[in-house]
C-alpha cells in the first residue's frame, strides 16, 4: 500500500512564505489605517474645541531679569481669551521669543476663565466694580444698541466675554494688565437676579420693586 507523499518541494516553500508576507503586510496596512483614522478624528475634535476660543494680544513688552552673568532678556505677552458666550480669561506668558510668550499667555488665560452671566440683550444684570492693585474699573449695564463703551484692555475683556451693550469706566491706574484683571474681578462678582434673590432670601418681585 503506497503512502501519500507529504514532503514539500523546494518550489512550494517560497510560495508559502510569500503568502504569509502578503497577509502580514495587509494586516499592517489595515492597522495603520485605523490608527491614522482615529488620529484624524482626534485632531478634528481638538481643532473644533480650539476654534471656539478667540485670543487677542493686549500688550507685548521686552523685559529683562538681572542674573549672575548679567541681564537676561525675554518677552512678556498679555493675552485675553474668550468664546464670546460668557467665558473669558486673562493670561500672561513669558518666553525668549514673541510666539512662545503669546502661546504661554493663551494657555494661562484658559486656566483662569470666568463665567459671566449675560442677559437676553447681551448685557450684564447689575452694576459691578472691580479692583486690582491701583486699578479700579466700574461697569454697568446698558440698553440694546448702546454697544461697548470702554477702551483699552477693558474693552477687549468685555468683547471676548460676549457683552454687546455695556458702559465701563477706568478709575486709577492706566496699566493694561491691572485694568484687564480689575475688569475680570468685576465680571466674576456678577450674579443673576435669581442668585441675588436666593442669597438675600427674598423673592424676585422684591428685587424688581
From Swiss-Prot:
Compositionally biased region (Low complexity): 18-28
One GO MF term: rRNA binding
This protein's domain notes: The N-terminal domain interacts with the head of the 30S subunit; the C-terminal domain interacts with the body and contacts protein S4. The interaction surface between S4 and S5 is involved in control of translational fidelity.
Keywords annotated in UniProt: Ribonucleoprotein, Ribosomal protein, RNA-binding, rRNA-binding
InterPro entries tied to this protein: Ribosomal_Su5_D2-typ_SF, Ribosomal_uS5, Ribosomal_uS5_bac-type, Ribosomal_uS5_C, Ribosomal_uS5_N, Ribosomal_uS5_N_CS, Ribsml_uS5_D2-typ_fold_subgr
Keyword Transmembrane (UniProt): no
Name of the protein this chain belongs to: Small ribosomal subunit protein uS5
Cited function: With S4 and S12 plays an important role in translational accuracy. Located at the back of the 30S subunit body where it stabilizes the conformation of the head with respect to the body.
GO cellular component, one term: small ribosomal subunit
Source organism of this protein record: Prochlorococcus marinus (strain MIT 9313)
Complex formation: Part of the 30S ribosomal subunit. Contacts proteins S4 and S8.
Biased composition range(s): Basic and acidic residues: 31-55
Gene Ontology biological process terms from the UniProt entry: translation
Annotated spans, Disordered: 1-55
Stretches assigned to the S5 DRBM domain: 53-116
